[in-house]
Amino acid sequence: IYYILNEKIMKLITAILGLTLFDRFLEGGALFMSLILICLLMSIFFTVKSILKIKTDKEVSKKILKHISDSGTLGLALGVMGAFLGLISAFDVLEASGAAEPAIIAGGLKVALLSPLFGLFTFSVSKLAILILRIIQK
């Protein structure tokens, strides 16, 4: 049952995005996308840790909010840095080829925008978690 459900979910995602999420992840550059994923996982870890500490130690729970914010901001910064490095490498390829074909430019821009998009997603998740935790803590 799990396999069938997972397969249907992946087909739905594939139909919406045109590619699987893993393919988009690799297309955005494995290094920066992996670093941003680590930031997302850290944000989730600190969010869960803060939720578990709310009842026992509210002060520690409030201090953890800074870690959630920092990991989300780092994910966003890494995404922007990945975009700039991707654009620089795309411009190097254009310079070496001598021809600015629209398909090459469009492909380079698409790849360059994937890492900041994932970084923005990480940042948004962390800010949403902080907002919810602040509401719960009051």
Walk through the language-model features, giving the residues of each.
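Hydrophobic alpha-helical transmembrane segments of small proteolipidic membrane proteins, enriched
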Residues: 11-138
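Short, Lys/Arg-enriched N-terminal segments with co-localized hydrophobic residues
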Residues: 1-12
